[in-house]
Amino acid sequence: MGASSSSALARLGLPAQARPRWLGVAVLGLAAVALGAVAWRRAWPRRRRRLQQVGTVAKLWIYPVKSCKGVPVSEAECTAMGLRSGNLRDRFLLVIKEDGHIVTARQEPRLVLVSITYENNCLIFKAPDMDQLVLPSKQPSSNKLHNCRIFGLDIKGRDCGNEAAQWFTNFLKTEVYRLVQFETNMKGRTSRKLLPTLDQNYQVAYPDCSPLLIMTDASLVDLNTRIEKKMKMENFRPNIVVTGCDAFEEDTWDELLIGSVEVKKIMACPRCILTTVDPDTGVIDRKEPLDTLKSYRLCDPSERELYKLSPLFGIYYSVEKIGSLRVGDPVYRMV
């Protein structure tokens, strides 16, 4: 040990031979302090965020088949790809043409009359004037894998068999259709391809563009004060309905905490002709509620490139933290 080092240790009251052990303890202590400081700084922004209650969960809906009836649930798991209750997953089933192109209530309005329930590990489909269709909740891996086309993007789907195909073909009575199922090992449609100008990074199966759609009952009440034929929430097909807030207050919500789930706003929901399909009759109107919504719910001119001339009603969200939620949960805005 050099003279300068020995004198420094002596000033601390330590013998020269204690240096290796003392320095090891000191280094470990400093490392622990540094790691603790980094962890604290990373956690600090989250701890600092204020929670402002903006409403309460009034309803939760899962739509097992795209464009078919929703299933109301009292609680649900919120996965990165949307709501789940047991083996019911949101929009993990899809009706397609023989060439793989998507079929929705925009083309076949009577799809909204098809209901789905889950019993004994089976999906049960019902529709007017049809015998019920019973399918296993998971399709055999030996079934054909289809290349499906949804709004210009490709995605896989496992065929649900000839019985399901015949059932939907007989019910819709226009052309041959097939039913396919998304599997969790398949690659979803990515946000980078769906909405390349936006920040979030997520995947969806067969929804239009997001894992979640949130609406408020106050906004529907407001619409119904302006329109002759009253609309139902089923016209708009949200996953989460919030009560206890003002009409269109949801326009101002960015990040929300619901139950143990954190979600982040993607964009407002631009509405299309599907909202004009009567959920009770399967008859398409093609005018309302779109005409009324266009009179007061168009986007700001600065956002015209994104939304075009579609009226905005409801908000699309991505799932930032998975968890569970239930009817009655408070909805907090994270500010």
UniProtKB/Swiss-Prot annotation:
Entry keyword annotation includes Kinase: no
Cited PANTHER family: MITOCHONDRIAL AMIDOXIME REDUCING COMPONENT 2, MOLYBDOPTERIN COFACTOR SULFURASE MOSC
GO cellular component: mitochondrial inner membrane; mitochondrial outer membrane; mitochondrion; peroxisome
Protein name: Mitochondrial amidoxime reducing component 2
GO annotation (BP), single: nitrate metabolic process
Summary of subunit composition and partner proteins: Component of a complex composed of cytochrome b5, NADH-cytochrome b5 reductase (CYB5R3) and MTARC2.
Domain MOSC, residue spans: 188-334
Membrane topology label: Peripheral membrane protein
PROSITE patterns: MOSC (PS51340)
Keywords associated with the record: Acetylation, Isopeptide bond, Membrane, Mitochondrion, Mitochondrion outer membrane, Molybdenum, Oxidoreductase, Peroxisome, Transit peptide, Ubl conjugation
Gene that encodes it: MTARC2
Modification after translation: Ubiquitinated by PRKN during mitophagy, leading to its degradation and enhancement of mitophagy. Deubiquitinated by USP30.
Catalysed reactions, semicolon-separated: N(omega)-hydroxy-L-arginine + 2 Fe(II)-[cytochrome b5] + 2 H(+) = L-arginine + 2 Fe(III)-[cytochrome b5] + H2O
Pfam families recorded: MOSC (PF03473), MOSC_N (PF03476)
Domain of life: Eukaryota
Cofactor binding annotation: Binds 1 Mo-molybdopterin (Mo-MPT) cofactor per subunit.
